[in-house]
């Protein structure tokens, strides 16, 4: 295992070989023979599963938690927990009203599952360090988080209701930045903004709505001295240039 090699590669440095990061989410539960619904709500199980995944796959880095519903749940979205998958978001409070109109504020360390995640990080970080494995913190990106808050309406709102879309995505960006700060405090070596649904929009739309609302999070990672990354899913070739301009290390 080679934590520094992964950090170097993420920062654009040449390495002797490609580092290896298995994105083990609910697979961590499988490795320790637990149901995913229990796993994602128990600090001891999370720590055990993350350590097991790092050891089993000889990982150079491993996510502390691969669950993009954490921030949404922490501000009031209701989740559906599953035995064999990550939780899904069931309710979307901003379907018809902006976060300001609803009086939604910033989550704290005691909101939602954040206490569980902080506890799991404290338990597993020393084990990962001993294995020379980087701990990755994954913060839900602005557009994906906005889709949790407002539902699929957000994808038409970026064209037809721009003022509404800006209000929701700006709020999501602030939540993302606070999430990043939490992961930095936990000691994550690499912190990524994970915005999978951003691949569904045009580069021009990304620049208008996503780019400005990632900057606080990216700056928070860099201010901490941590390594930053931006994750996208699907066919993201059209977005490569604009994602790079957001300013992550990798």
What are these regions, as identified by a protein language model?
Residues 67-107, 123, 130:
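A contiguous, low-structure linker/loop signature
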Residues 31-35, 74-75:
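Short, glycine/acidic-enriched capping/hinge loops at junctions between secondary-structure elements
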Residues 64-73, 136-144:
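Short, glycine/charge-rich beta-strand/loop segments that flank catalytic centers
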Residues 39-40, 74-88, 143-157:
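Aromatic- and acidic-residue-enriched segments that line the glycan-binding/catalytic groove
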Residues 44, 48, 115-118:
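A structural signal for well-ordered alpha-helical segments within the folded catalytic domains
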Residues 1-28, 36, 107-250:
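Active-site loop segments of alpha/beta catalytic cores
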Residues 34-45:
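Surface-exposed strand-loop-strand hairpins of Gram-negative outer-membrane beta-barrel proteins
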Residues 45-66, 181-189, 245-246:
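Catalytic domains of carbohydrate-active enzymes, especially glycoside hydrolases
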């Amino acid at each position: 295992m080679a934590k520094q090699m992964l950090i170097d590669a993420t920062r654009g440095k040449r390495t002797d070989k490609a580092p290896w990061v298995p994105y083990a989410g609910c697979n961590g539960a499988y490795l320790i023979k637990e149901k995913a619904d229990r796993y994602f709500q128990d600090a001891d199980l999370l720590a055990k599963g993350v350590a097991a995944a790092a050891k089993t796959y000889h990982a150079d880095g491993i996510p502390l938690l691969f669950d993009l519903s954490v921030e949404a749940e922490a501000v009031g979205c209701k989740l559906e927990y599953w035995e064999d998958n990550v939780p899904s978001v069931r309710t979307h409070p901003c379907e018809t009203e902006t976060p300001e109109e609803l009086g939604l504020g910033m989550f704290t360390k005691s909101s939602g599952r954040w206490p569980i995640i902080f506890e799991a990080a404290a338990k597993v970080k020393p084990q990962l360090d001993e294995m020379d494995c980087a701990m990755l913190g994954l913060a839900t990106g602005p557009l994906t988080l906005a889709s949790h808050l407002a539902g699929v309406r957000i994808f038409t709102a970026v064209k037809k209701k721009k003022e509404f879309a800006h209000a929701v995505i700006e709020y999501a960006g602030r939540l993302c930045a606070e999430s990043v700060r939490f992961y930095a405090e936990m000691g994550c070596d690499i912190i990524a903004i994970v915005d999978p649904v951003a691949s569904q929009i045009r580069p021009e739309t990304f620049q208008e709505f996503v780019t400005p609302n990632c900057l606080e999070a990216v700056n928070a990672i860099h201010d901490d001295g941590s390594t930053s990354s931006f994750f996208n899913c699907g066919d993201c070739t059209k977005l490569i240039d604009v994602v790079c301009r957001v300013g992550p290390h990798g």
